């Protein structure tokens, strides 16, 4: 997936929320919370079409858009790209912070506990830094 800006992400969220949307609907939704002009939003839509993240079709004078990737795939790509930039030794601390800061139901917590119990079977003795020397401060080089 191509890198998308925060503003483009907002457009994708509108597209993910419905099977297919018009440009005017995207504009209406985003202008509720942003001071963006119609042309700015149309430019964002065009960029996403160019990046092959949105498909477009014309019906009369109206343009319809639909997401070409799932919301789950978009979210996973965003998170995995971020984690790829961070020393693997620090991932656990970040995950702990995410868990601490994320509202969860008891069922969500049960699911995480089950996942961690399964993860124990393939656990390594020590997580080894994969960074090039001089790229991080984890002191594992």
Where do the model's predicted regions map?
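Short, cationic-aromatic polyanion-contact patches
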Residues: 3-7, 59-79
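Pre-recognition alpha-helix immediately N-terminal to the DNA-recognition helix
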Residues: 6-14, 25
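Short acidic, hydrophobic short linear motifs in intrinsically disordered regions
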Residues: 21-30
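Short, hydrophobic-biased segments on the C-terminal half of alpha helices
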Residues: 42-46
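Glycine-centered, phosphate/nucleic-acid-interacting loop/turn motifs that mediate DNA/RNA or nucleotide
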Residues: 52
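Short beta-strand "wing" residues that participate in macromolecule-binding interfaces
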Residues: 56
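Conserved segment of winged-helix/HTH DNA-binding domains
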Residues: 70-96
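C-terminal regulatory/oligomerization modules of transcriptional regulators
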Residues: 100-141
């Amino acid at each position: 997936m191509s890198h998308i800006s925060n503003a483009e992400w907002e457009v994708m969220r509108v597209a993910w929320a419905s099977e297919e949307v018009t440009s005017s609907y995207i504009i209406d939704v985003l202008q509720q919370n942003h001071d963006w002009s119609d042309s700015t939003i149309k430019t964002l839509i065009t960029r996403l079409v160019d990046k092959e993240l949105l498909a477009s079709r014309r019906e009369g004078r109206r343009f319809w858009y639909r997401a070409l990737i799932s919301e789950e795939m978009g979210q996973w790509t965003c998170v995995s790209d971020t984690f790829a930039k961070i020393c693997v030794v620090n991932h656990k601390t970040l995950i702990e912070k995410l868990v601490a800061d994320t509202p969860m139901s008891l069922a969500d917590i049960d699911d995480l506990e089950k996942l961690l119990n399964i993860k124990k079977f393939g656990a390594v003795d020590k997580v080894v830094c994969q960074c090039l020397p001089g790229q991080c401060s984890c002191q594992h080089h």
